[in-house]
Amino acid sequence: MSTTLLSPFYDIDFLCKTEKSLANLNLNNMLDKKAVGTPVAAAPSSSFTPGFLRRHSASNLHALAHPVPSPGSCSPKFPGAPNGGGSSCGPAGGGGLASYGQLKEPSGGSGTALVTKESKFRDRSFSENGERSQHLLHLQQQQKGGSGSQINSTRYKTELCRPFEESGTCKYGEKCQFAHGFHELRSLTRHPKYKTELCRTFHTIGFCPYGPRCHFIHNADERRPAPSGGGGASGDLRAFGARDALHLGFAREPRPKLHHSLSFSGFPSGHHQPPGGLESPLLLDSPTSRTPPPPSSSASSCSSSASSCSSASAASTPSGAPTCCATAAAAALLYGPGGAEDLLSPGAPCASCSSSGANNAFAFGPELSSLITPLAIQTHNFAAAAAAAYYRNQQQGLTGPAPPPAQPPAAPAPPSPPFGFQLPRRLSESPVFDAPPSPPDSLSDRDSYLSGSLSSGSLSGSESPSLDPGRRLPIFSRLSISDD
């Protein structure tokens, strides 16, 4: 046999071996992949392209194991070649029809070998054999048997068993997940802020769906010390009212009381006066103390003689003193700083409030007297000069000087000149004014000064229609006791 005939045979044999090795490589790649329906690349020289193969298809597996050679690969290229030249392609050299028939009817031996090779790469389409099922069942039984000794839950034995506490017996026995007695009770690792804040649901509607398992405070005995860096518990305590604080039994600071115990309707509210007058000087600077009450309360509870000076005193006072005690400012204008200090002694309310029996929370203390004293010093000279000038004009208008009456409020008020009542009105309208120099005889006669100031006050236009001229006001009755 010549070398020209051997070289084609050698090429054909090499090509067939290469195709077999490629087919085996593709089969291993397909078995390693887990996804069903993965496309498998066939041999580039083979005419059979399976496409998307099902992994549980035995015929496809056998087709990959025995690929179909191309018709030209096994046919003799040279006419001089013997018929045995095609037999060098292996068992498929018998013809394409025989190989194609093997795709549909695989032999039992080759199919069993392929399934055995693939047993370690089981897919969902293959049913599990008996050995694997028994192994899984054995593992499940071991897990169930060891559940009594293993603690799977973090709350194991952290709560008492309710049936055991009630009846003394438990049907689960030693396998019970709850503690049968305090000796089995374990401490559970809690959050650092556990039981440090109030339960909003429980303290709002009175019911909590979590019950004793709630992580927030329901009762006072459940409270735990708050962590060092957290101040949320104190903020939550302030968020609730006095009813919740009394229910929990916590010590709570008293709420600051307002200055104005008189409501806008003029009636006293139900606040009680604490002993000692004002609670603190800081209350004078609170926003609520700067709101003056309506003028209706001044007309109902204050005297007509002091109402002309009440608006000026309330406007120039920094704390906005209530107008129900405007007689104190009038006394400061009449008697100077000494009279104001006597009237504004601690625990001495005004006569109108004391006669009505109201528990007024606004009690005059040293702080208020110190605030009103500069007002009395500023307005004392001007009021004295105005009263003296009015009294001189009154005596000049009459035929003879009338003696001052024994009781100044009971004296009838004579008609006054036009300028007699303009000065007090200017005093009531402008809170800031300049005091003119006082005449030397303005403080010579105290009774005449008192009568003149009272007469000017009665003609200032603020006299109430129900005032009896023959009846003395309560504030002047108390002040005249020392004179008599």
Curated annotation (Swiss-Prot):
InterPro entries: Tis11B_N (IPR007635), ZFP36-like (IPR045877), Znf_CCCH (IPR000571), Znf_CCCH_sf (IPR036855)
Single GO biological process annotation from the record: somatic stem cell population maintenance
Keywords, in A-Z order: Cytoplasm, Developmental protein, Metal-binding, Nucleus, Phosphoprotein, Repeat, Ribonucleoprotein, RNA-binding, Zinc, Zinc-finger
Segments of skewed composition (Basic and acidic residues): 117-134
Expression (tissue specificity): Expressed in preadipocytes and adipocytes (at protein level). Expressed at highest level in lymphoid tissues such as thymus, spleen, lung, uterus, ovary, small and large intestine, mammary gland, fat and bone marrow. Expressed at intermediate level in kidney, heart, adrenal, eye and fetal liver. Weakly expressed in brain, skeletal muscle and liver. Expressed through B lymphocyte development. Expressed in superior cervical ganglion (SCG) and dorsal root ganglion (DRG). Expressed in embryonic stem cells (ESCs). Expressed in oocytes.
Signal peptide coordinates: none
Induction or repression: Up-regulated in response to fibroblast growth factor FGF4 in embryonic stem cells (ESCs) in a p38 MAPK-dependent manner (at protein level). Up-regulated by glucocorticoid agonists, such as dexamethasone (DEX), in burst-forming unit-erythroid (BFU-E) progenitors in a receptor NR3C1-dependent manner. Down-regulated during erythroid cell differentiation. Down-regulated during the conversion from quiescence to activated satellite cells upon muscle injury.
GO CC, one annotated term: cytosol
Ranges annotated as C3H1-type zinc finger: 155-183, 193-221
Name listed for the protein in its UniProt record: mRNA decay activator protein ZFP36L2
Organism of provenance: Mus musculus
